[in-house]
Swiss-Prot record:
Binding site for [4Fe-4S] cluster: 177, 181, 184
Source species: Synechocystis sp. (strain ATCC 27184 / PCC 6803 / Kazusa)
Protein family according to the UniProt entry: Belongs to the methyltransferase superfamily.
Alphabetic keyword roster: 4Fe-4S, Iron, Iron-sulfur, Metal-binding, Methyltransferase, S-adenosyl-L-methionine, Transferase
Full protein name: Uncharacterized methyltransferase slr0309
Any one GO biological process: methylation
Free-text comment on the cofactor: Binds 1 [4Fe-4S] cluster. The cluster is coordinated with 3 cysteines and an exchangeable S-adenosyl-L-methionine.
EC numbers for this chain: 2.1.1.-
Amino acid sequence: MEHKPNEFVKRAMKIDIIIVYIQRYRKGHEVHFVPPLTGIHLAALTPAKHTVRVIHQQVETVNLDSEADVIVLSFFSGFAPEAYRLATEYRKRGKITIAGGPHVTFAPEEALRFVDSIVIGEGESVWEQIFQDIEQNTLQQRYIGEAIPLTNIPTPRYDLLPPQYFIRRVVQATRGCPFTCSFCTVPVLNPGFRTRPVEAVLNDIRYNKFKWWWQRKTVWFWDDNLTANRPYIKELLRQMIPLRKWWLTQASMDITKDDELLDLMRDSGCIGIFFGIESFGQESLEDAGKRQNKVAEYQGKIKKLHDRGIGVMAGFISGLDGDTPESIRDMANQLEEIGVDVPFLSILTPFKGTRSYSKMMDTDRLRSDLGWEFYNGYNVTFVPSKMTPAELLKAHRDLWRSAFSLQAIFRRIGRSLFTLRGGAMMMCSIMNLFYGLKALTNNEPISFEGTDEYKSIRETIDLIPYSRQNSLS
């Protein structure tokens, strides 16, 4: 069945925004910690005359027989096969399909094989135009979003979130990051560093129509580097103090050089900071482009947060060029020694648009037998420098099991009783128990090796991540 755009001219439409997901753990889980911002942000930008729903495939079932007129699909590379499967099914049912997100930006020609229209880059500047064009039967194949000032960003549609998310108030105050880590797409996707007006951010924080007290109390900043603009963040934090919230975000370790900032973070209710530590090896840090990280300083920097009762979440990447199976397994002990409260453990994934991808292409190290579903942070998509792909996968899983063993979980929780304030201790304990339960029930990250779920899609549409055709590298 072909869709007929003329049907939609000059009338209100039903729009489904689907945040595409492929399960990353063996058994999945019914409750997730924090929702993505994209869907409820786009919903807030949608003209009021239209009816919009946001479906998070991470926690909700996608209805292929939806009554929606327009289907919007947003996805990362690891979820591209599922996005294309959904798009194919929706087009059979006569729906207008639109795709956007990081993967579409870096693989536009590929995406256009499955949808009617794509958004490249940031979507705010073209979002309203898309629906005007649908009404006029002039929908374009491509819309190029510009990196516009963040002065008119509305409060997200929190009312459209499903109940399965533990934290619900997700906020963005800034966009971009001044650093250029080799594995990160942010410098290309979100160029420059931009800030929203402080009062607009405070309006989001004041939104309080949530069921549970911790949802009304907690703010999760979905910023890539919230503290990069020091005058801005200090003013925001001063304004947040009277609101008496708990908040978490991501920042660079260089914040520990600024005691005034750390004190403001404490006074405004910070309970957790995520640092991208990535590695304990100098060669691996150089491979990651993490010039700002100094291994000898890790413990002292984390202590400065603990001295203020703030929890430290930290990301570690396995598979950088300096890594060996032994160094990866050793990270379980090393992250304990420096005082990390909640570790996040991933495998290097060379996404299109990153220097890692270009490097792997140039050295012929991308694995040519794998589809996009492997690009989810938990599978090996390239040939490592000092081990085989199988050795890297095993070392990562050994690290994961060790870091989330019951002994490690309760050591971290026990330490938090003496180093963290109440909100930080509670949040870090919940996160640790969340992952500890996974380890206890063998709910590990899925290894896609040997699985055929998306084989037919790969064969049909020739999704080849390593292809130079139509790629931005």
